[in-house]
């Protein structure tokens, strides 16, 4: 743990404690100098309870394809993830998550990329250039809605400062968001340069922290605590042996369905419940709000270009639908996909106008197994975001975690555990 003190005009000294967790995860809890007990209790109020199992560990096996070794987006070689979780006082529950396609200079070694929009009620900065040029040139960062401009500005600063970028005059930061305003002081715009730099610099391969971490700290899904989730699928050698990894930031609603079982309905928490039962919506509960958004980040080592990456991203929406998402008017549903295939990197030097690419690409016919892989990985990543999240309090509101024991009972009842 590293503790740094900062001066403040309005407060006394601020104490910022940074805890390094899995895959570069960091928690920043800021309090006025009231002693370590108050700092500890603040973090405990926001993220209470012991670590919870992932969906597969609890017996929920999704689909037919096997997961990668970590069952995470980091199963795609070279991909790393970093989180900064911001917990301050009683009202700040937010953060930043960074996904790096590789560990080099992304501007000088761009990766093929694409964005697919399921519903465009969102602020995905940088998406138009990605789809125009078919390239991603910065880390993919996720945050809270009103933090997008601040995070984008910080990503630009980070990229401009990299050795080799001294002559760069245009940067396209790719920043996704969901609205965490129910639990978080969203108007405070608490993620800035320091947090973004920390998320990028702390990014690591290996196991990825899930649940109430990074950009998922203050999110809500299906009326329960949402967050960050990840999963992967590995194709057999006969199909190329490629890996597809997915990371999600869940903050949307609907009627939670797990492996086809009506979990949300049997838990009594689902979209339109009040209208269907009382014919009125004068006092709708949290689960009755389907809005909020989801960002789906997809990585693969398969050699596919922008066109087929966009097709891959589109199929992730089928995995989203499998979970019971309502696809509401107010939910910004976005998928970002990139390939890490080294032969497809767009290498740019100061004078590279005549660069040619001649890499072999997968055919359209070879895409179908990858489509199934991304559907399954997206579905399981969403479940992991719910299974790993913990009950969280912020801004006077408490959002309960998905009750795992009761959920497993429902799944057993419907024969939805295992294969």
Can you name each region flagged by the protein language model?
Residues 1-4, 20, 36-37:
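Low-complexity, intrinsically disordered short segments enriched for Gly/Pro and polybasic residues
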Residues 14-18:
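Short, hydrophobic alpha-helical membrane anchors of single-pass surface/secreted proteins
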């Amino acid at each position: 743990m590293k503790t740094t003190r900062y001066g403040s005009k309005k407060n006394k000294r601020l104490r910022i404690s940074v805890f390094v967790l899995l895959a570069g995860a960091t928690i920043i809890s800021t309090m006025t100098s009231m002693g370590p007990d108050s700092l500890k209790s603040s973090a405990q109020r926001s993220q209470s309870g012991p670590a919870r199992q992932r969906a597969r560990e609890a017996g929920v096996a999704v689909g037919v394809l096997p997961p990668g070794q970590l069952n995470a987006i980091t199963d795609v070689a070279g991909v790393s993830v970093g989180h900064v979780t911001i917990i301050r006082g009683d009202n700040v529950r937010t953060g930043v998550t960074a996904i790096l396609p590789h560990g080099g200079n992304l501007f000088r070694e761009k990766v093929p990329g694409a964005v697919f929009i399921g519903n465009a009620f969102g602020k995905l900065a940088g998406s138009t250039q990605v789809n125009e040029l078919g390239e991603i040139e910065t880390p993919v960062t996720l945050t809270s809605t009103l933090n997008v401009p601040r995070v984008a500005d910080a990503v630009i600063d980070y990229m401009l400062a990299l050795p080799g970028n001294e002559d760069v005059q245009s940067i396209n930061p790719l920043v996704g968001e969901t609205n965490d305003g129910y639990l978080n002081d969203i108007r405070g715009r608490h993620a800035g340069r320091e947090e973004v730099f920390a998320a990028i610099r702390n990014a690591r391969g290996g196991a990825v922290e899930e649940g109430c971490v990074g950009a998922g700290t203050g999110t809500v899904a299906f009326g329960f605590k949402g967050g960050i989730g990840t999963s992967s699928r590995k194709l057999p050698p006969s199909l190329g042996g490629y890996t597809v990894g997915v990371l999600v930031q869940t903050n949307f609603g609907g009627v939670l369905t797990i492996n086809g079982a009506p979990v949300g309905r049997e838990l009594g928490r689902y979209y339109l419940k009040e209208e269907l039962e009382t014919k009125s919506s004068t006092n709708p509960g949290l689960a009755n709000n389907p809005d909020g958004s989801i960002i789906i980040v997809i990585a693969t080592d398969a050699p596919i270009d922008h066109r087929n990456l966009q097709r891959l991203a589109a199929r992730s929406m089928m995995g989203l639908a499998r979970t019971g998402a309502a696809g509401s008017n107010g939910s910004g549903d976005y998928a970002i996909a990139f390939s890490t295939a080294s032969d497809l990197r767009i290498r740019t030097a100061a004078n590279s106008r005549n660069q040619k690419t001649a890499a072999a690409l997968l055919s359209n016919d070879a895409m179908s197994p990858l489509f199934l892989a991304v559907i399954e990985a997206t579905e399981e990543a969403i479940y992991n975001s719910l299974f790993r999240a913990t009950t969280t309090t912020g801004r006077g509101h408490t959002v309960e975690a998905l009750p795992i024991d009761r959920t497993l009972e429902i799944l057993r009842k419907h024969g939805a555990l295992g294969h």
